[in-house]
Amino acid sequence: MPGRPSLAGRCLRGSRRTGGMGGGGSALRVCADHRGGINWLSLSPDGRRLLTGSEDGTARLWSTADGQCCALLQGHESYVTFCHLEDEAAFTCSADCTIRKWDVRTGQCLQVFRGHTSIVNRILVADNQLFSGSYDRTARAWSVDKGQVSQEFRGHRNCVLTLAYSAPWDLPGAPCAEEAGGLLVTGSTDGTARVWQVAGGGCWQTLRGHTGAVLCLVLDTPSHTAFTGSTDATIRAWDILSGEQLRVFREHQGPVICLELVNRHVYSGSADRTVKCWLADTGERVRTFAAHGHSVSALKYHAGTSKNAIPNYSYGSKGKQSPPLNWFPESTMVSKEREREQRPAQTGYLDDALRSYCRRSRK
């Protein structure tokens, strides 16, 4: 198995845990079928299945109802870096330089996407296209059905870590948006984000301003705005059509690892062990959630249910249960925390287990 330069996190144990926040908050079940750490997880649109990608080179499908493993997806020749789950298909990418599409009912591999020459870091599925970013410094667009490359995006001087896509119809008033076939935004360890025309592969804009690697990004397509998070501890807002930097969000004390945009609010998770909430339009910080014991590597806003019981998934470290960030009426912020690996550079994070919590909103 090749060495690991990936910025994606690793787990110390290949276990997935589910538990409740009531009482002592002990785990209700432990699913330890993986033989290596869990690098990523994806929840199906209907919430009934969970997909995990592991250091052991496999992905597994789980029932969220009982925690049972529904299918083993095996075929990759190295660790799985990222995974994405839809209703009928699962997608995984790996350090073996390939992407695979799977049948979620049978576990059968339906398609192998070959073309990248180094580790594939991220994938994104939209409009019957699959987009990928790799350590080979390229991003690529593929036909989901045929597994063939339809476009290559070259220009970054270092590896591509993060992706976001906007369809032409999501860009009202954007010049030549339809001819461009939509816009792909990529973030790289070269410190830039780039905006690409999907149809032609040309670079529309280069977003320069960060002084560290761009680790995460989200798009607000109605306003043509991209938000990027970096190892320089800042979040920056950009006009993706003009390339203009609109504002800088400064308060984090460590790399910004993950972003979520909800209802004109930007949520950010950082290596400084906090999640912060910002007003997207002004950059004003309106709230800080500082209950985490380790770096926050992923977060997800989840709307509440009629019973105010929200199932959440998070990573903890060293067997410690992840504490709740806070209580939200009718909603919650799901987060995943990681402990930084002891290395000279800020390149790796270690996780211990995946847990499921039920957090009830405060009246």
Language-model regions, residue ranges each:
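Intrinsically disordered, low-complexity acidic/Ser/Thr/Pro-rich linker and tail segments
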Residues: 1-40, 48, 53-55, 60, ...
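WD40/WD-repeat beta-propeller blade N-cap
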Residues: 31-38, 74-80, 114-120, 154-160, ...
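Conserved strand-to-loop turn within each blade of WD40 beta-propeller repeats
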Residues: 53-56, 93-96, 133-136, 187-190, ...
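Short loop/turn segments that connect beta-strands within beta-propeller blades
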Residues: 64-66, 104-107, 144-147, 198-201, ...
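Terminal intrinsically disordered, low-complexity extensions flanking WD-repeat/beta-propeller proteins
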Residues: 293-295, 302-363
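Loop/turn segments within WD40 beta-propeller blades
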Residues: 42-47, 83-88, 123-128, 146, ...
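WD40-repeat beta-propellers
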Residues: 59-62, 83, 99-103, 139-142, ...
